[in-house]
Regions:
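Short "lid" loop at the C-terminus of a central beta-strand within the Rossmann-like core
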Residues: 40-45
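A C-terminal cap/extension of S-adenosyl-L-methionine-dependent methyltransferases
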Residues: 81-129
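Conserved acidic residues
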Residues: 1
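A conserved beta-strand element that flanks and buttresses the S-adenosyl-L-methionine
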Residues: 4-7
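Conserved Class I S-adenosyl-L-methionine
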Residues: 46-82
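A short glycine-rich, Lys/Arg-flanked "PGG" loop and its adjoining helix->strand segment in the class I
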Residues: 18-34
Length: 129
């Protein structure tokens, strides 16, 4: 049993709606099923971001409490890697107007973003307490 999305839930209109989608999609999985989702991730600012609109940008402060909530509910969430990387291409940012066909990081408004992946396994059985 498996759910997957690539750069989609940041287009639901707000940070809150994106996180709600992640929680609700778990209901479609059987116990022990897996969900893998990627989204835009703000690496330049953990305070200010695009919180609503056509594209939102998630921050560590949005992701971490959500992950802790999932774990508290008994789901497994793979450890997240927030490192920026150490290779030369990790330090290149595709700025507006976007010219590079391939990029690891790009500018959206005043923010530098990359993709982050969430790997979630639905709890294997229902809790009775």
């Amino acid at each position: 049993d498996f759910n997957w999305s690539s750069c989609s839930f940041e287009h639901l209109g707000s940070i809150e709606k994106g996180l709600r989608f992640l929680k609700e999609q778990l209901k479609t999985l059987k116990p022990g099923g897996w969900a893998v989702h990627t989204t835009e991730f703000n690496i330049s600012n953990n305070d200010k971001t695009l919180e609503d609109g056509d594209t939102v940008i998630f921050r560590m402060r949005d992701i971490e409490p959500f992950v802790q909530e999932l774990r508290k509910d008994g789901h497994f969430v793979e450890e997240l890697d927030y490192s920026l990387g150490g290779l030369p291409e990790d330090f290149m940012v595709d700025v507006l107007p976007h010219q590079q066909k391939v990029h690891l990081k790009l500018q959206l408004n005043e923010f530098v973003v990359t993709s982050i992946g969430l790997i979630i396994q639905k709890r294997k059985r229902k809790r009775f307490f």
